[in-house]
Amino acid sequence: MQAIILAAGMGKRLGNLTQNNTKCMVEVGGVRLIERALYILDKKNLSRIVMVVGYQCENLMQFVDGLGIDTPVEYIINEVYDRTNNIYSLSMAKDWLVKEDTLLLESDLIFEEALIDLLLEDSRETLALVDKFENWMDGTCLVVDEDDRIVDFIPGKLLEYSQKERYYKTVNIYKLSADFSRNVYVPFLEAYARVMGNNEYYEAVIKLILMLDKNTMRAKRLEGQRWYEIDDIQDLDIAEVLFAADAGERYKKLTSRYGGYWRFPHLKDFCYLVNPYFPPARMMEELKSNFDILVRQYPSGMRVNCLLAAKTFGISEEHIV
């Protein structure tokens, strides 16, 4: 088993944090993303770790070489990182991909070691790691059946939020057997890139393969293990909370936010002062029913609002200020 890490991107949405370094060099809790990932992978007795690098690659390679991990690291340099996407980076690693079973992951992830163990301990050869869809997630989503078959790939722009209970999110960590890579994935990857170009995503190739044969890959579902994808400074801020060094530090970071805890779906807040009777169910139903109109139309002026308030509270308009 080997690992391939895609780390060529520029991470523009992180602004100044990636001005002189690639995205995987940003820190969460004082530890760089790539450092955390490599130390986890180094424990798994892998034959090698292949990194496809591009933007600010000299800084990245120098840093990785200085970590002193035991697993050999091979580098592939994507010189055209600024005008290609991850399908091109992965195609550059195809000769490694067909050699042996592979853990494929993207470098902008922060995750628990348990995620890697889930894939390694599962006897199934080709797996996509997935998590139940939550409101903070974006990007490609999946529909998974009771046998863990991936029955649909849904691009982020086509998500129907009314159907979100059916969705799973790709974590962007995969286990690919050498046989699957050699006989299925790489041939499709090459053909897809020839037709569609190199500014595409490798997930599109997986979607195409599964449209033809849903048995080539299964979904491996997470069960509460922590992970986060770092695309912008808000992601980074949330990851600082999720991956705080200990419970005390996590508590400090959470309480300093003074709300907005819906961004942490599994958090139970026992301190926030709320009125449990408001809003009543009837009011919520009416708001939902009129939501489209409320969003699209502009409100009445002050005179009409004073009139409505006077009617609601049973007082004269002159007493509304």
Regions found by a protein language model. Give the residues of each.
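Conserved alpha/beta core of the MobA/IspD/sugar-nucleotide pyrophosphorylase nucleotidyltransferase superfamily
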Residues: 1-3, 167-266
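N-terminal glycine-rich phosphate-binding loop and ensuing alpha1 helix
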Residues: 1-60, 310
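Catalytic metal- and UDP-sugar-binding loop of GT-A-like glycosyltransferases, i.e.
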Residues: 6, 105, 270
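Acidic donor-binding segment of Leloir-type glycosyltransferases
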Residues: 55-74
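Conserved beta-loop-beta/alpha segment of the NTase-like Rossmann-fold superfamily
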Residues: 68-146
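Conserved core of the sugar-phosphate nucleotidyltransferase
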Residues: 112-196
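N-terminal "arm"/small-domain region of PLP-dependent enzymes with the aminotransferase-like
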Residues: 241-297
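Short loop-beta-helix segment that forms the pyridoxal 5′-phosphate
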Residues: 299, 309-321
